[in-house]
Amino acid sequence: MASGVSPAHPQTPVGAGSRDLSLKGTPSDGMQPRGADTLEGHSLPTDGPPHRGGDHDPAAGKRGDSGLLRVCAALSIPKPSEAVRPSRIPRAPRVPREPRVPREPREPRVPRSPREPRVPRIPRDPRPPRPPRVPREPRPPREPRATRGLA
């Protein structure tokens, strides 16, 4: 058993040309390295879908592009006709409103007279502090109920 591998997930051998990675994250024999390891102009086929058009085709796959993001985006974005649906809530038919009757203008408001200033509250004298509690004496133990009722 290799160190760091749990028994629930045994390490499976990775064959040549396999797209899987081993648990340690090393590329299999058939995979081309990506990123900094790749040569800029190498002639080997790269991972990803084949190029559809020329260099300027926006839908063509980039080197190292699996195309999965573009496929998922194409499947998950609804068309505008699907996105704007009439609501299923039945609406009451609109009743035409009566035309508004113009009202006569209001008289201008008379500003209120300022209120009288409040009389400040006179604070009461604080209460005298309570005397400290004196602990009571414990009560004598009571006799059991059975003997009390018979006497």
UniProtKB/Swiss-Prot annotation:
Biased composition (Basic and acidic residues): 49-65, 95-151
Positions of region (Disordered): 1-151
Domain of life per record: Viruses
Region (11 X 6 AA tandem repeats): 90-146
Subcellular location: Host nucleus, Host nucleolus; Host cytoplasm
Processing and modification events after translation: May be phosphorylated on Ser residues by host kinases.
UniProt comment concerning the protein's domains: The N-terminal tetrapeptide may be responsible for virion incorporation. The C-terminal half, rich in Arg and Pro residues, seems to be responsible for the RNA-binding activity, and for the association with ribosomes and the localization to the nucleolus. This region may adopt a poly-L-proline II helix secondary structure.
Subunit structure: Associates with RNA derived from the 60S ribosomal subunits. Seems to form large heterogeneous polymers of up to 200 identical subunits in the cytoplasm. Interacts with host EIF2AK2. Interacts with host NCL. Interacts with host RIGI; this interaction prevents RIGI binding to host MAVS. Interacts with host IFIH1; this interaction prevents host IFH1 binding to MAVS.
Protein name: Probable RNA-binding protein
Organism annotation: Human herpesvirus 2 (strain HG52) (HHV-2)
Encoding gene per record: US11
